[in-house]
Protein backbone atom coordinates (compact mmCIF):
# COMPACT_ATOMS: atom_id res chain seq x y z
CA UNK A 1 0.00 0.00 0.00
CA UNK A 2 1.31 3.43 -0.97
CA UNK A 3 0.94 6.31 1.47
CA UNK A 4 2.24 9.78 2.19
CA UNK A 5 3.40 11.31 5.45
CA UNK A 6 2.21 14.90 5.87
CA UNK A 7 1.78 17.41 8.64
CA UNK A 8 -0.09 20.60 9.41
CA UNK A 9 1.98 22.62 11.89
CA UNK A 10 3.40 19.42 13.38
CA UNK A 11 0.04 17.63 13.63
CA UNK A 12 1.12 14.61 11.57
CA UNK A 13 -0.81 12.31 9.29
CA UNK A 14 -0.55 9.16 7.26
CA UNK A 15 -2.54 9.89 4.09
CA UNK A 16 -3.80 7.06 1.88
CA UNK A 17 -5.34 7.18 -1.59
CA UNK A 18 -8.33 4.81 -1.59
CA UNK A 19 -9.44 6.07 -5.00
CA UNK A 20 -6.81 4.10 -6.97
CA UNK A 21 -6.01 1.49 -4.28
CA UNK A 22 -8.18 -1.09 -2.52
CA UNK A 23 -7.61 -0.65 1.21
CA UNK A 24 -9.30 -1.64 4.45
CA UNK A 25 -8.34 -0.39 7.90
CA UNK A 26 -9.39 -2.24 11.03
CA UNK A 27 -8.94 -0.48 14.39
CA UNK A 28 -6.16 -2.97 15.21
CA UNK A 29 -4.29 -2.16 11.99
CA UNK A 30 -4.64 1.58 12.56
CA UNK A 31 -3.22 1.30 16.08
CA UNK A 32 -0.28 -0.72 14.74
CA UNK A 33 0.42 1.76 11.94
CA UNK A 34 0.14 4.69 14.37
CA UNK A 35 2.78 3.27 16.71
CA UNK A 36 5.88 5.45 16.37
CA UNK A 37 8.20 2.59 17.34
CA UNK A 38 6.97 -0.26 15.12
CA UNK A 39 4.70 1.47 12.59
CA UNK A 40 4.60 4.63 10.50
CA UNK A 41 3.62 6.87 13.42
CA UNK A 42 0.94 9.56 13.21
CA UNK A 43 -1.70 11.52 15.10
CA UNK A 44 -4.40 10.68 12.55
CA UNK A 45 -4.89 8.53 9.47
CA UNK A 46 -6.56 10.33 6.54
CA UNK A 47 -8.25 8.31 3.81
CA UNK A 48 -9.18 9.75 0.39
CA UNK A 49 -12.23 7.92 -0.98
CA UNK A 50 -14.27 8.36 -4.17
CA UNK A 51 -17.23 10.74 -3.80
CA UNK A 52 -20.66 9.44 -2.85
CA UNK A 53 -22.31 12.31 -4.75
CA UNK A 54 -21.49 13.47 -8.32
CA UNK A 55 -21.46 17.09 -7.08
CA UNK A 56 -18.50 16.28 -4.80
CA UNK A 57 -14.84 15.61 -5.57
CA UNK A 58 -13.93 13.19 -2.74
CA UNK A 59 -15.05 11.66 0.54
CA UNK A 60 -12.78 12.47 3.51
CA UNK A 61 -12.36 9.97 6.36
CA UNK A 62 -10.35 10.51 9.56
CA UNK A 63 -9.16 7.94 12.08
CA UNK A 64 -7.44 8.71 15.38
CA UNK A 65 -4.31 6.87 16.45
CA UNK A 66 -6.45 4.73 18.78
CA UNK A 67 -8.43 3.39 15.80
CA UNK A 68 -11.60 5.41 16.37
CA UNK A 69 -13.17 7.22 13.43
CA UNK A 70 -13.98 10.92 13.82
CA UNK A 71 -15.89 13.36 11.66
CA UNK A 72 -13.61 16.40 11.58
CA UNK A 73 -9.94 17.39 11.50
CA UNK A 74 -9.04 20.87 10.32
CA UNK A 75 -5.28 20.34 9.97
CA UNK A 76 -6.04 17.09 8.17
CA UNK A 77 -8.36 18.89 5.76
CA UNK A 78 -5.52 21.15 4.65
CA UNK A 79 -3.22 18.14 4.13
CA UNK A 80 -6.03 16.35 2.29
CA UNK A 81 -6.29 19.24 -0.19
CA UNK A 82 -2.53 19.32 -0.81
CA UNK A 83 -2.39 15.52 -1.15
CA UNK A 84 -5.06 15.16 -3.84
CA UNK A 85 -3.35 17.84 -5.92
CA UNK A 86 0.17 16.45 -5.40
CA UNK A 87 -1.00 12.96 -6.43
CA UNK A 88 -2.81 14.21 -9.52
CA UNK A 89 -6.22 13.12 -8.28
CA UNK A 90 -7.48 16.62 -9.14
CA UNK A 91 -6.08 19.89 -10.44
CA UNK A 92 -8.84 22.00 -8.90
CA UNK A 93 -7.99 24.73 -6.42
CA UNK A 94 -11.46 24.62 -4.86
CA UNK A 95 -12.13 21.06 -3.72
CA UNK A 96 -15.52 19.95 -2.38
CA UNK A 97 -15.49 16.95 -0.05
CA UNK A 98 -17.96 15.10 2.13
CA UNK A 99 -17.21 14.02 5.68
CA UNK A 100 -19.07 11.88 8.19
CA UNK A 101 -21.21 14.85 9.16
CA UNK A 102 -21.46 17.13 6.14
CA UNK A 103 -19.52 18.89 3.40
CA UNK A 104 -16.43 21.08 3.28
CA UNK A 105 -14.83 23.32 0.65
CA UNK A 106 -11.03 23.31 0.64
CA UNK A 107 -9.37 26.16 -1.29
CA UNK A 108 -5.67 26.07 -2.20
CA UNK A 109 -4.23 29.59 -2.50
CA UNK A 110 -1.57 30.75 -4.95
CA UNK A 111 1.10 30.48 -2.23
CA UNK A 112 -0.04 26.91 -1.43
CA UNK A 113 -1.72 27.74 1.85
CA UNK A 114 -5.11 26.09 2.26
CA UNK A 115 -8.27 27.96 3.26
CA UNK A 116 -10.97 25.74 4.68
CA UNK A 117 -14.64 26.62 5.01
CA UNK A 118 -15.31 24.89 8.33
CA UNK A 119 -19.03 25.68 8.35
CA UNK A 120 -20.90 27.52 11.08
CA UNK A 121 -19.98 26.74 14.70
CA UNK A 122 -22.85 25.06 16.54
CA UNK A 123 -23.33 25.95 20.21
CA UNK A 124 -26.41 23.79 20.78
CA UNK A 125 -25.56 21.23 23.50
CA UNK A 126 -27.29 18.39 21.63
CA UNK A 127 -25.10 19.03 18.57
CA UNK A 128 -21.81 18.77 20.45
CA UNK A 129 -23.02 16.49 22.20
CA UNK A 130 -22.88 17.98 25.70
CA UNK A 131 -25.19 17.37 28.65
CA UNK A 132 -26.79 20.72 29.49
CA UNK A 133 -30.32 22.05 29.90
CA UNK A 134 -29.74 24.95 27.50
CA UNK A 135 -26.96 26.64 25.56
CA UNK A 136 -24.76 28.99 27.58
CA UNK A 137 -21.75 31.12 26.62
CA UNK A 138 -19.92 29.82 29.69
CA UNK A 139 -20.47 26.60 31.64
CA UNK A 140 -19.33 25.77 35.15
CA UNK A 141 -17.98 22.22 35.45
CA UNK A 142 -16.34 20.18 38.19
CA UNK A 143 -13.19 18.24 37.33
CA UNK A 144 -10.49 16.80 39.57
CA UNK A 145 -11.93 18.55 42.62
CA UNK A 146 -11.75 21.96 40.97
CA UNK A 147 -14.18 24.30 39.24
CA UNK A 148 -13.63 24.80 35.52
CA UNK A 149 -15.19 27.61 33.46
CA UNK A 150 -15.42 26.74 29.78
CA UNK A 151 -17.17 27.27 26.48
CA UNK A 152 -18.51 24.34 24.47
CA UNK A 153 -19.04 24.16 20.70
CA UNK A 154 -19.24 21.72 17.81
CA UNK A 155 -17.05 22.30 14.76
CA UNK A 156 -18.30 19.01 13.35
CA UNK A 157 -16.59 17.44 16.38
CA UNK A 158 -16.94 18.25 20.10
CA UNK A 159 -14.81 20.98 21.68
CA UNK A 160 -14.43 22.41 25.15
CA UNK A 161 -12.44 25.66 25.48
CA UNK A 162 -10.93 26.78 28.79
CA UNK A 163 -9.42 30.25 29.17
CA UNK A 164 -6.10 30.26 31.06
CA UNK A 165 -3.67 32.95 32.19
CA UNK A 166 -0.63 31.23 30.63
CA UNK A 167 -0.72 28.26 28.26
CA UNK A 168 2.87 27.38 29.14
CA UNK A 169 1.92 26.57 32.74
CA UNK A 170 -1.63 25.32 32.10
CA UNK A 171 -2.38 21.84 33.49
CA UNK A 172 -2.93 20.34 30.03
CA UNK A 173 -1.53 16.90 30.90
CA UNK A 174 -3.66 16.64 34.06
CA UNK A 175 -6.90 18.42 33.17
CA UNK A 176 -6.92 17.44 29.48
CA UNK A 177 -7.66 13.71 29.88
CA UNK A 178 -10.09 14.34 32.75
CA UNK A 179 -12.14 16.83 30.75
CA UNK A 180 -11.87 14.76 27.54
CA UNK A 181 -13.74 11.91 29.24
CA UNK A 182 -16.01 14.03 31.47
CA UNK A 183 -19.47 12.52 31.93
CA UNK A 184 -21.07 15.60 30.37
CA UNK A 185 -19.38 14.72 27.05
CA UNK A 186 -21.00 11.37 26.08
CA UNK A 187 -18.75 11.08 22.99
CA UNK A 188 -15.70 12.63 24.72
CA UNK A 189 -14.30 15.98 23.57
CA UNK A 190 -11.24 17.90 22.41
CA UNK A 191 -10.04 20.22 25.16
CA UNK A 192 -8.53 23.61 24.29
CA UNK A 193 -6.52 25.79 26.67
CA UNK A 194 -6.70 29.39 25.39
CA UNK A 195 -4.65 32.40 26.46
CA UNK A 196 -6.00 35.70 25.09
CA UNK A 197 -3.08 37.99 24.21
CA UNK A 198 -5.30 40.65 22.61
CA UNK A 199 -8.53 40.66 20.61
CA UNK A 200 -6.72 39.63 17.42
CA UNK A 201 -4.27 37.13 18.92
CA UNK A 202 -4.50 34.02 21.12
CA UNK A 203 -2.14 31.27 22.19
CA UNK A 204 -3.57 27.76 22.31
CA UNK A 205 -2.78 24.21 23.38
CA UNK A 206 -5.17 21.36 22.59
CA UNK A 207 -5.60 17.94 24.18
CA UNK A 208 -7.20 15.99 21.34
CA UNK A 209 -9.80 13.30 21.81
CA UNK A 210 -8.16 9.94 21.16
CA UNK A 211 -4.72 11.42 20.45
CA UNK A 212 -3.60 13.43 23.50
CA UNK A 213 -1.88 16.79 23.17
CA UNK A 214 -0.77 17.55 19.61
CA UNK A 215 1.39 20.35 18.24
CA UNK A 216 -1.61 21.83 16.45
CA UNK A 217 -5.34 21.25 16.12
CA UNK A 218 -7.15 23.05 13.32
CA UNK A 219 -10.70 22.46 14.50
CA UNK A 220 -9.50 23.29 18.03
CA UNK A 221 -8.22 26.66 16.81
CA UNK A 222 -11.57 27.28 15.13
CA UNK A 223 -13.45 26.29 18.28
CA UNK A 224 -11.32 28.54 20.49
CA UNK A 225 -11.94 31.57 18.28
CA UNK A 226 -15.67 30.80 17.98
CA UNK A 227 -15.99 30.54 21.77
CA UNK A 228 -13.86 33.65 22.28
CA UNK A 229 -16.02 35.66 19.87
CA UNK A 230 -19.24 34.38 21.45
CA UNK A 231 -17.93 35.47 24.87
CA UNK A 232 -17.01 38.93 23.56
CA UNK A 233 -13.27 38.39 23.99
CA UNK A 234 -12.07 38.32 20.37
CA UNK A 235 -12.32 40.17 17.06
CA UNK A 236 -13.64 38.68 13.80
CA UNK A 237 -10.13 37.86 12.54
CA UNK A 238 -7.71 36.17 14.93
CA UNK A 239 -4.15 34.87 14.74
CA UNK A 240 -3.90 31.58 16.63
CA UNK A 241 -0.44 30.66 17.90
CA UNK A 242 -0.07 26.91 18.52
CA UNK A 243 3.04 24.96 19.57
CA UNK A 244 3.48 23.94 15.92
CA UNK A 245 2.91 27.35 14.35
CA UNK A 246 0.25 29.82 13.21
CA UNK A 247 -3.30 29.55 11.89
CA UNK A 248 -5.54 32.43 10.83
CA UNK A 249 -9.22 32.16 11.74
CA UNK A 250 -12.03 34.42 10.52
CA UNK A 251 -15.67 34.37 11.64
CA UNK A 252 -18.29 37.09 11.23
CA UNK A 253 -20.56 35.53 13.84
CA UNK A 254 -23.86 33.61 13.90
CA UNK A 255 -25.30 32.88 10.46
CA UNK A 256 -21.86 32.85 8.82
CA UNK A 257 -19.32 30.09 8.12
CA UNK A 258 -15.93 30.12 9.85
CA UNK A 259 -12.74 30.06 7.77
CA UNK A 260 -9.35 28.62 8.69
CA UNK A 261 -6.17 29.36 6.70
CA UNK A 262 -2.83 27.65 7.21
CA UNK A 263 -0.03 25.53 5.73
CA UNK A 264 0.15 21.84 4.87
CA UNK A 265 3.50 20.08 4.37
CA UNK A 266 4.37 16.91 2.46
CA UNK A 267 7.16 15.01 4.25
CA UNK A 268 7.70 11.80 2.27
CA UNK A 269 6.02 9.01 0.28
CA UNK A 270 6.22 5.40 1.40
CA UNK A 271 5.11 1.85 0.66
CA UNK A 272 4.15 -0.66 3.32
CA UNK A 273 3.30 -4.37 3.08
CA UNK A 274 0.21 -5.19 5.13
Curated annotation (Swiss-Prot):
Substrate binds at residues 11, 44, 64, 74-75, 157, 190, 208-209, 218-219. The record marks 159, 208 as: Could be important to modulate the pK values of the two catalytic cysteine residues. The active site is at 73 (proton donor), 217 (proton acceptor). SUPFAM superfamilies: Diaminopimelate epimerase-like. InterPro entries: DAP_epimerase_AS (IPR018510), DAP_epimerase_DapF (IPR001653). GO terms for molecular function: diaminopimelate epimerase activity. It catalyses: (2S,6S)-2,6-diaminopimelate = meso-2,6-diaminopimelate. GO terms for biological process: lysine biosynthetic process via diaminopimelate. It comes from the Bacteria. GO terms for cellular component: cytosol. Keywords: Amino-acid biosynthesis, Cytoplasm, Isomerase, Lysine biosynthesis. Its EC number is 5.1.1.7. The record marks 268 as: Important for dimerization. Pathway: Amino-acid biosynthesis; L-lysine biosynthesis via DAP pathway; DL-2,6-diaminopimelate from LL-2,6-diaminopimelate: step 1/1. It is found in: Cytoplasm. Homodimer. Belongs to the diaminopimelate epimerase family. HAMAP family: DAP_epimerase. Catalyzes the stereoinversion of LL-2,6-diaminopimelate (L,L-DAP) to meso-diaminopimelate (meso-DAP), a precursor of L-lysine and an essential component of the bacterial peptidoglycan. This is Diaminopimelate epimerase.
Amino acid sequence: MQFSKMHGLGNDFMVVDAVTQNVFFSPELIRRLADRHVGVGFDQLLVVEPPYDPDLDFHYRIFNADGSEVSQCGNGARCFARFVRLKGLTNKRDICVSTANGRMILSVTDDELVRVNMGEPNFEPSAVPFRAIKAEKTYIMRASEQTVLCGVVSMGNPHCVIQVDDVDTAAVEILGPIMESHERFPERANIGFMQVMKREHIRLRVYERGAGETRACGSGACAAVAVGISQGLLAEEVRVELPGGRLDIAWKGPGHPLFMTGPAAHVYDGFIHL
